[in-house]
């Protein structure tokens, strides 16, 4: 009989043969096995008597967690700073926190409170991974939203939650192949997230350890003396024979030669002129060895200075060739301590400043074409990707290249600040500029897409002022007043608005456009139904930010009243100056 594919008769015969074996044999084997088990159990009787759930585990000892280090807070810091520090360390698990009080920086520091009004305290923190940073930034945004009733400005936070439209666009870009300037198709890792909290001027940077080391933001927010003390010296290659003597000798030799070149450069800056340019150039070339990056940089500075004085001695292409000689130098390639990415950034900025100095010898389009080719070539020497749009000076110089003037004189924020410092007793050089409107629009859009792409972000105040002054000196007054109104509305503090009113009056008086002055004094100066200087001046208890500011405004109002004394608005401005 077959059941489920097996022979039942065969199974029965096997069962019969099994049970027909002698019982004594089976019992003997079973007894022997039991005896062996008992003997083995005697060796470890203690463990056998303890139930399995009460036995000690042979796991490794539990590691003691590192204690959370909370940095000390600056003196007289707001309570919100303590809240954010506790939140980042205790709640989010971020480490290596550093707090910078920007009020302690020198006045000439680019991040001091005198130079900018947006940041008061800066917090740097490190995350374990990109996911950790994204999670912390997400929770931080929710905390600020529910606690302070507004959304912070967050940059660098990238989520995988992409809309269907964006996915289709990315898929099309993948089929076309990656562009020459990017390989991530706009989706970068959360290695650096910046959060402008909008609370007491506190800005928080969340970075991965690798990105924090490469960016070195501590240097940006620290004093220069502190940076020099904390700067780590490059490692010495100890595998080489007599490494100490050899490297020390070459370093001292390079420093000596650099001092000689620096003295020649300083002498030319002080005593050089059109006739002596060739002599200084020959003396410099005779002592130039090219053994260090600093020597090439000093040569670039001297050649650039000579080109401004006598372009027949040093031509523009010779200045650019200095940079290419530096990157093709075999001696420099063997020096492992050189940070080439930093050099590329510095050389790009220097080259842009050189293009600005060329003035009217080249049009804005020709200058930007030169810059495009230069950046395309120099970035080939970069070990890692470099994002020039993260550098503020790059954006400022990029906008500056959109216009030229006859003698390169133009009003900017530095000139207006100098007028205030001298209480109005300063006459900066002014000139009508030639602005390429289409090119300026393209540059503005380029900056917006690459650095200020979020709809909630706008250009920083200093860049918006630079653009506004460009429009005014180019005679584009419609765009000037449009940007002027936008800036005025963005200023929430009365003292900031007072300062903006003063620099506007100074700017228009130096540009000396009668229609623009009339527009200011008839529409905005004492407007009862909108924004006006008189209203802000009254709200500020008839006070200026400084006596220099008051004297500078008084001086310029008197000049306007004297020059346009036949106009009622000018006489009204002069009467106001008499009461200051």
From Swiss-Prot:
Membrane topology of this protein: Peripheral membrane protein
GO molecular function annotations of the record: proline-tRNA ligase activity
Keywords per UniProt: Membrane, Mitochondrion, Mitochondrion inner membrane, Transit peptide
Statement: the UniProt record of this protein carries the keyword Repeat: no
Keyword Disulfide bond appears in the UniProt entry: no
Pfam families given in the database record: RsfS
Annotated compartments: Mitochondrion inner membrane
UniProt GO BP: mitochondrial gene expression; mRNA stabilization; prolyl-tRNA aminoacylation
Cellular compartments per GO CC: mitochondrial inner membrane; mitochondrion
Organism domain of life: Eukaryota
Transit peptide (first-last residue): 1-38
InterPro entries documented for this protein: Atp25 (IPR040152), NT_sf (IPR043519)
Alphabetical list of PANTHER family matching this protein: ATPASE SYNTHESIS PROTEIN 25, MITOCHONDRIAL
Entry's family note: Belongs to the ATP25 family.
The protein's role, per its UniProt record: Probable mitochondrial mRNA stabilization factor.
Name of the protein: ATPase synthesis protein 25, mitochondrial
């Amino acid at each position: 009989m077959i059941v489920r594919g097996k022979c039942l008769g065969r199974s029965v015969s096997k069962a019969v043969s099994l049970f027909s074996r002698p019982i004594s044999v089976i019992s003997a084997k079973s007894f022997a096995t039991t005896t062996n088990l008992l003997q083995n159990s005697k060796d470890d009787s203690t463990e056998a008597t303890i139930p399995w759930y009460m036995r000690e585990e042979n796991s490794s000892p539990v590691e003691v967690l590192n204690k959370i280090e909370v940095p000390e807070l600056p003196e007289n810091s707001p309570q919100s700073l303590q809240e954010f520090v506790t939140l980042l360390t205790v709640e989010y698990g971020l480490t290596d926190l550093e707090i910078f009080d920007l009020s302690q920086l020198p006045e000439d520091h680019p991040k001091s409170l005198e130079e900018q009004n947006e940041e008061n305290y800066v917090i740097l923190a490190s995350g374990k991974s990109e996911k950790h940073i994204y999670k912390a930034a997400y929770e931080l945004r929710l905390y600020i939203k529910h606690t302070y009733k507004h959304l912070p400005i967050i940059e660098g936070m990238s989520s995988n939650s992409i809309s269907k439209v964006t996915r289709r666009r990315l898929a099309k870009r993948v089929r076309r192949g990656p562009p020459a300037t990017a390989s991530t198709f706009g989706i970068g890792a959360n290695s650096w997230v910046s959060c402008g909290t909008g609370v007491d001027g506190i800005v928080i940077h969340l970075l991965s350890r690798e990105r924090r080391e490469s960016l070195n933001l501590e240097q940006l927010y620290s004093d220069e003396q502190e940076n020099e003390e904390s700067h780590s010296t490059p490692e010495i290659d100890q595998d080489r024979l007599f490494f100490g003597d050899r490297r020390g000798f070459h370093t001292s030799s390079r420093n000596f030669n650099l001092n000689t070149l620096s003295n020649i450069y300083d002498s030319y800056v002080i005593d050089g002129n059109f006739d002596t340019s060739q002599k200084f150039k020959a003396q410099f070339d005779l002592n130039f060895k090219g053994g260090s990056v600093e020597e090439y940089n000093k040569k670039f500075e001297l050649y650039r200075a000579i080109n401004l004085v006598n372009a027949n001695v040093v031509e523009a292409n010779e200045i650019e060739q200095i940079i290419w000689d530096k990157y093709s130098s075999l001696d420099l390639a063997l020096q492992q301590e050189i940070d080439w990415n930093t050099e590329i950034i510095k050389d790009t900025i220097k080259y842009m400043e050189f293009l600005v100095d060329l003035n009217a010898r080249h049009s804005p389009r020709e200058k930007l074409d030169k810059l495009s080719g230069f950046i395309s070539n120099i970035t080939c020497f970069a070990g890692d990707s470099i994002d020039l749009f993260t550098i503020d000076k790059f954006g400022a110089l990029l906008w500056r290249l959109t216009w030229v003037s006859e003698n390169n004189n133009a009003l900017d924020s530095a000139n207006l600040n100098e007028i205030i410092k001298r209480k109005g007793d300063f006459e900066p050089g002014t000139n009508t500029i030639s602005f390429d409107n289409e090119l300026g629009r393209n540059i503005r859009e380029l900056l917006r897409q690459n650095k200020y792409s979020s709809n909630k972000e706008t250009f920083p105040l200093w860049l918006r002022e630079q653009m506004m002054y460009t429009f005014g000196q180019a005679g584009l007054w419609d765009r000037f007043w449009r940007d002027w109104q936008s800036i005025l509305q963005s200023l929430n503090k009365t003292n900031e608005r007072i300062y903006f009113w003063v620099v506007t009056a100074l700017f228009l008086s130096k540009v000396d456009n009668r229609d623009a002055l009339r527009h200011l004094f008839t529409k905005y100066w004492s407007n009862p139904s909108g924004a006006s200087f008189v209203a802000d001046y009254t709200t500020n208890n008839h006070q200026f930010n400084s006596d220099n500011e008051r004297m500078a405004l008084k001086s310029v109002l008197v000049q306007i009243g004297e020059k346009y004394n036949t106009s009622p608005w000018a006489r009204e401005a002069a009467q106001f100056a008499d009461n200051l």
